[in-house]
Design a protein with these regions (language model features):
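N-terminal catalytic cores of secreted or lumenal carbohydrate-active enzymes
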Residues: 2-246, 250, 267
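A structural micro-motif
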Residues: 119, 206, 286, 345-346
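Acidic carboxylate-rich catalytic motifs and surrounding loops in phosphoryl-/glycosyl-chemistry enzymes
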Residues: 125-127, 349-355, 360-362
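Noncatalytic carbohydrate-binding groove/subsite architecture in carbohydrate-active enzymes
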Residues: 185-334
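Active-site rim elements
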Residues: 321-325, 360-368
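Substrate-binding cleft of secreted/luminal carbohydrate-active enzymes
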Residues: 327, 331-356
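Conserved small/polar residues in nucleotide/adenosyl-binding loops
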Residues: 374-381
């Protein structure tokens, strides 16, 4: 009979586990926002229209960080549409998910919700249809004190003090052909470097996250990541990694073994970053933000069919799934991979928080279902075993 020996010792320390590894993600997609966390007419809504039952669950999970507002959604998003008087906010076409965006929930609503849930925000700027100037204006609105056009705009919206948002993603999945404003690595690297440079002129204390590959299966991986890092290494603080797994129909063994692929993905991308570090003779080690990860069982063609069947609706139910025990096991394996690489990965966002590949499933006009798949109540150190 074969036996396995596991040796644990507190001296086998990899690194401290950053609390930001236990984050999540909110995108204007399907019912993630509307009836997910925000539903003024729901019996569970508080005075601001936020679902108190969901707030309680987020606190129970001890979610530390939440990324917003996307996701594919952000690549055509105008942040100005989601601030100011709600009755004056425009309804817009959401081109990413072919729905109608009411803009009833925007920057200031999210920040109010973040305060109630005790989470640190990560904001994403639009580098699909917009660029350097827009990102600078958004940062000025959020973080500059007063006396300028956009800081005074924020104050006129009832937010006197700047938010001081520290973590910013420079676009989303720009390597993907599905992305609005899709760019080559060279094109994206240039605009990300310039955007980051300008944003750090406004607020030198912010941390910037540049787009890596959308998945390890992308044809351009890891060449994309290498070229982007080559152009942004001096201004970037993190490289974003995204990874989802499905394939339950292939059987339990094959399905659960996918965490090995994730481990190899991270080891490869760490090596890529080291190559660029040596090329630039830099003293800085690039860190990583796995700001979209999870088990997503709904096939992409099914999601597309759902959208085709009900296009241009407000917050339609799309890509909703209920986790199984098998899903939870792979979910746990993926989280262990992240923790084992705690010396390099400092941010991680389980995707998504509500209703799509989520731990919290809500009923519009009703209650919710909750699966406590993870919590930030973890040990301080990551250890080799």
């Amino acid at each position: 009979m074969e036996t396995t020996k596991v040796v644990c010792n507190k001296e086998f320390q990899i690194d401290r586990v950053d609390s930001r590894l236990f984050g999540s993600f909110l995108e204007h997609m399907g019912r993630v926002i509307y009836s997910g966390i925000y539903e003024p007419d729901n019996k569970n809504a508080d005075e601001d229209g936020f679902r108190q039952d969901v707030i309680d669950r987020v606190k129970e999970m001890n979610v530390t960080t939440v990324r917003y507002p996307g996701g594919n959604f952000v690549s055509a998003y105008h942040w100005e549409d989601g601030v100011g008087a709600k009755e004056k906010r425009p309804h817009k076409l959401d081109l990413a998910w072919r729905s109608i965006e009411t803009n009833e929930f925007g920057t200031n609503e999210f920040m109010k919700w973040a305060k109630k849930t005790n989470v640190n925000p990560i904001f994403t700027v639009n580098l699909g249809t917009r660029g350097v100037e827009d990102a600078a204006h958004y940062l000025e609105y959020c973080n500059f004190s007063s006396g300028t056009q956009y800081s005074d705009m924020r104050k006129s919206h009832g937010v006197d003090e700047p938010y001081g948002i520290k973590m910013w993603c420079l676009g989303n999945e720009m390597d993907g052909s599905w992305q609005i404003g899709h760019k080559s690595a060279e094109e994206y690297g240039k605009i990300a470097a310039e955007t980051g440079k300008v944003m750090k002129l406004i607020d030198p204390d912010i941390e910037l996250i540049v787009c890596g590959s959308s998945l390890s299966s992308m044809d351009t991986y890891p060449e994309w990541d290498m070229e982007v890092l080559d152009k942004t290494y001096d201004v970037a603080d993190y490289l974003a990694l995204h990874q989802y797994y499905a394939g339950q129909e292939k059987g339990t063994k094959t399905f659960l073994a996918q965490s090995v692929d994730m481990e190899e993905y991270i080891h490869t991308i760490r090596s890529v970053a080291q190559v660029i570090k040596q090329k630039k003779r830099s003293k800085k080690d690039m860190k990583f933000s796995v700001d979209e990860w999870g088990v997503w069982a709904v096939p992409s063609n099914t999601v597309n069919n759902e959208i085709d069947e009900k296009p241009w609706q407000i917050a339609p139910a799309i890509s909703e799934q209920i986790y199984t025990l098998e899903d939870a096991l792979l979910f746990a394996e993926m989280q262990m991979v992240i923790i084992r690489n705690a010396d390099a990965i400092k941010i991680a966002c389980q995707s998504l928080l509500t209703n799509i590949s989520a731990c919290i499933m809500t009923e519009k006009g009703g209650g919710h279902w909750f699966c406590l798949l993870y919590t930030s109540d973890a040990a301080d150190d990551s250890l080799r075993v």
